[in-house]
């Protein structure tokens, strides 16, 4: 079908659509409705319902480069064509305008609800998958933090015995703990971002049960985790300084002798004390007994915290690693499924209602066509007719016919009995004696 003459096509109550003639409109509708080529023979219709029309709309990508006003016009034409195609299939019962509109819009509304339910379930699965991956990462980070705590405790325990081994264990454990803390912070940020994005998408599909604000409220657990992260990073930097000091001391044999004397006796000459204190200030070698006890207690507390986090993550993975956001999205999808079932039942009930209305209307029409005569009216049927008897000769009696046609009894009217014959009357054809 060639395209008609280009012109401005205007729909009543809307703006003018420039450059779209009547032939172009028919060509576009055929492209959308029938799914065939624009130029060529029209194939058989493959999209008989509004749902398939919407799917064809998306597949053909005809609206990707169309202005919003033009898209509105084309949408109007599409709906007009749909109403024309579905007019014959609309039930003719005594339905209200609202019920007829419901029957017209139900396929589109059903398609939208099915798409929303599918998208909500997909979002919930994505949130659970992301949460499971981040939980495994947090599990590894917690185990690394626990190993870091063990190494710090061993470094403190070996400080009086070996200076190099103690500093090496302490620095490695502190660095590993800082890396684990940073990993936990990053996983928390990524999980919050994933949940926020999923909730933003779900809020466009339906109302959520709980409100969510990106920067609302104070999350004390995240603040605590950030504090531990900063503390471990500071300790890691200090451990690097301790290792650097140990390497400097190891390169000088005389200085190492003074360090060993300081570690054994806690006493060195006053002219060299300042250099030793400056070299090992804040290290495990320069700790007093009280500081050593406090350091061991802090390392033990961090070790217990990392072990508790590890066990919680492990148990959460065994339970399926489900999040509250995913459960809320699935609850919303379940609610939409219930609404879809209710609308489907109502859609099935309307054609039955229309058919029952049509049958009752036909019954009333048949009953109204019958003529009921009033009481006392005369029957249109003739009275009983006696069979015709030929005139007989003299001396032959008249025979009474065996069969007579009886008149039907009408409502409120009985046929009058025949008059009795007079005694002095003789039968015709007989002569007096």
Curated annotation (Swiss-Prot):
The gene is APOL5. The keyword Transport applies. Residues 422-433 have a biased composition (Basic residues). This is Apolipoprotein L5. GO terms for biological process: lipid metabolic process; lipid transport; lipoprotein metabolic process. Residues 346-433 are annotated as: Disordered. It comes from Homo sapiens. May affect the movement of lipids in the cytoplasm or allow the binding of lipids to organelles. One of its GO terms (molecular function) is high-density lipoprotein particle binding. Belongs to the apolipoprotein L family. It holds the Pfam family ApoL.
């Amino acid at each position: 079908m060639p395209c008609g003459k280009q012109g401005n096509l205007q729909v009543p109550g809307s703006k003018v659509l420039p450059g779209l003639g009547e032939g172009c409109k028919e060509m576009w509708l055929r492209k959308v409705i029938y799914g065939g080529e624009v130029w060529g023979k029209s194939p058989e219709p493959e999209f008989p319902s509004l749902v398939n029309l919407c799917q064809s709309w998306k597949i053909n990508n005809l609206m990707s480069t169309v202005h919003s006003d033009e898209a509105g016009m084309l949408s109007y034409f599409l709906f007009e064509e749909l109403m024309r195609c579905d007019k014959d299939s609309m039930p003719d019962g005594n339905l209200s305008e609202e019920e007829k509109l419901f029957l017209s819009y139900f396929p589109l509304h059903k398609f939208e609800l099915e798409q929303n339910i599918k998208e909500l379930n997909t979002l919930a699965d994505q949130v659970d998958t992301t949460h499971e991956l981040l939980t495994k990462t947090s599990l590894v980070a917690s185990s690394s933090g626990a190993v870091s705590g063990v190494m710090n405790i061993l470094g403190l325990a070996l400080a009086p015995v070996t200076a190099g081994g103690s500093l090496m264990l302490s620095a490695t454990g502190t660095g590993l703990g800082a890396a684990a803390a940073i990993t936990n912070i990053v996983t928390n940020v990524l999980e919050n971002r994933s949940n926020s994005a999923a909730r933003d998408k779900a809020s466009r599909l339906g109302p959520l049960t709980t409100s969510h604000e990106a920067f609302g409220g104070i999350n004390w657990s995240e603040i605590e985790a950030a504090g531990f992260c900063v503390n471990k990073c500071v300790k890691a930097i200090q451990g690097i300084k301790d290792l650097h000091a140990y390497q400097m001391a190891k390169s000088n044999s005389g200085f190492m002798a003074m360090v060993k004397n300081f570690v054994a006796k806690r006493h060195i000459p006053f002219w060299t004390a300042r250099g030793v204190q400056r070299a090992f200030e804040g290290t495990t070698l320069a700790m007093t007994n009280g500081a050593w006890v406090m350091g061991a207690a802090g390392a033990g507390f961090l070790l217990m915290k990392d072990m508790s986090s590890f066990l919680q993550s492990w148990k959460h993975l065994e339970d399926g690693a489900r999040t509250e956001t995913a459960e809320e999205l699935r609850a919303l999808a379940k609610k939409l499924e219930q609404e879809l079932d209710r609308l489907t039942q109502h859609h099935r009930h309307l054609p039955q209602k229309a058919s029952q209305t049509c049958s009752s209307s036909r019954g009333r029409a048949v009953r109204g066509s019958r003529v009921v005569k009033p009481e006392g009216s005369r029957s249109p049927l003739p009275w009983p007719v006696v069979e015709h008897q030929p005139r007989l000769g003299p001396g032959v009696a008249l025979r009474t016919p065996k069969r007579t046609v009886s008149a039907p009894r009408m409502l409120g009217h009985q046929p009058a009995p025949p008059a009795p014959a007079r005694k002095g009357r003789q039968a015709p054809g007989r002569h007096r004696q």
